Amino acid sequence: MPHKKSADGIGSGTRRQYLKTAGGATAAIASMTAGCLGNGNGNGDDVIRMGVLEDRSGEFSLTGIQKYHAQTLAVEEINENGGILGQEIEMIAPDPQSEVDRYRDLSRRLINEDQVDVLYAGFASSTREAVRPIVNENQQLYIYTNQYEGGVCDSYTFCTGAVPEQQISPVLPQLVDEFGPDIYTIAADYNFGQITASWYRTVAEEIGANIVGEEFIPLGVGDFGSTINNIQEEDPDILVTLLVGAEQAAFYDQKRAAGLDDLPMSTTVNMMQGYEHRRFDPPSLANMYVGVNYMEEIDTERNNSFVERYYDRWGDEAEYLGSMAQNSYFSTYLYKQAVEQAGTTDQDEVIEALEDGIEIEAPEGDIRMDPETHHMSHIIRVVRADENHNIEFTENLGEIEPFWLREGPGCDLLEEPDSSQYEPI
């Protein structure tokens, strides 16, 4: 049976009982207090208020800056083309600095003082879980754009990043077939790493593979000497790495120095988020495999246009355009499309539009919001880095639905309100 953890704020009854029923050339990037569009939260201002909390400093800024840049680009493009329903977006984007307490404080401020029409917030799962109880308490539309460990079934939260059944379930069996059944996992010691590791355990058991070792590394730790010794002692066929943040990234150079270049690696985060294949000296990432929904190297006309616009806008400030940045970009257009379909920024009606199987033309390809679970389908490609850190898209798996919440715990937010995170344990 799936294990269930709950965020505060949602009780029993139909979900509609709990939803709100309130009657320029560039984005306005601000952190001051102001109103929002009259038919949304009812402040009377003729702008759409978009709250954005992305880490532009601190432990997770490497990816947070990408996300902030991509969302700013989307807002600017939308405003340059007439806004949404003729209204410009005002993007209110204070820096949470990768600190959980700041996420709590700033979320309350954006919701209660700035009265945003929509909230985007968070890189780390710990920050998402700090925000969700506040979102549910205030019945606030919240879009979380990160790849994550999955399992959130929440009436007010829409998760637009990839989840384990899209990244692990289709990829790990291929690696086991090619390299062998013995797997060693090292993961960040918080909810993302712990739950994603449990996904690897679940899939490994289903395919007859073995988890021969598992370690959880506290955030901020950068010395992996004992971990590398343990890996060498177990001699696995595959190493799963679920490491997060600037300090934990030191593992890859230490692994290279220990002579483990030939050990195949599986992950859900590297290259697509932190562009380690660009930042680290070869062959630190050699034989890294990951199922990605997006990397800037995807060679399609649509994506090449997106990449060109991104670098034209940000110039030397832009170092890479990763999957989380792409998610933030298309999720801004997803909100635009939902508001236009609803004909209003009223959050109840925007949620109904998002739950209508809404589709979006993302840089990765055409994808769709799953109404019952509030998660996106994604186009998944298998990527491998060679000894020189050249990447190869070895297989296009096509569009994969976020099926586990429906088929496992039975999440159906059209029928039953919820605020839980379920785990495959």
PLM features: residue spans?
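Extracytoplasmic ligand/sensor domains, especially the bilobed periplasmic-binding protein
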Residues: 101, 105, 112-215, 263-289
